[in-house]
From Swiss-Prot:
Alphabetized UniProt keyword annotations: Elongation factor, Protein biosynthesis
Protein name: Elongation factor 1-beta
Similarity comment: Belongs to the EF-1-beta/EF-1-delta family.
Primary gene name: ef1b
Entry-linked HAMAP family: EF1_beta (MF_00043)
């Protein structure tokens, strides 16, 4: 089965949210077949940083990235989820 790489930008609820803990909660919430490969922090403004996550997921997922977006948005500490990039892996 083919897979896709999805780059997701996650904004925390506030500046006080520890991004490392948020990343671990998101990684723990991913279902089977999904894998968090890489991550980094992106400065936004006034001390606020976003998480940029590289997630591998199955290509034939009903609803595309919507399932992933909904799953991440339900994690405690997440304010906003935005898909920045999607690419099929060979």
């Amino acid at each position: 089965m083919a897979q896709v790489l999805v780059i997701v930008r996650v904004l925390p609820e506030d500046v006080e949210t520890p991004l490392d803990e948020l990343r671990k909660r998101i990684a723990g919430a991913l279902p089977e077949g999904y894998e968090l490969k890489m991550w980094d922090e992106e400065p936004i403004a006034f001390g606020l940083k976003a998480l940029r996550l590289a997630i591998i997921m199955p290509e034939q997922t009903e609803g595309g990235t919507e399932t992933l977006e909904n799953l991440i948005s339900q994690v405690q500490g997440v304010s906003q989820v935005e898909v920045e990039y999607v690419n099929r892996l060979s």
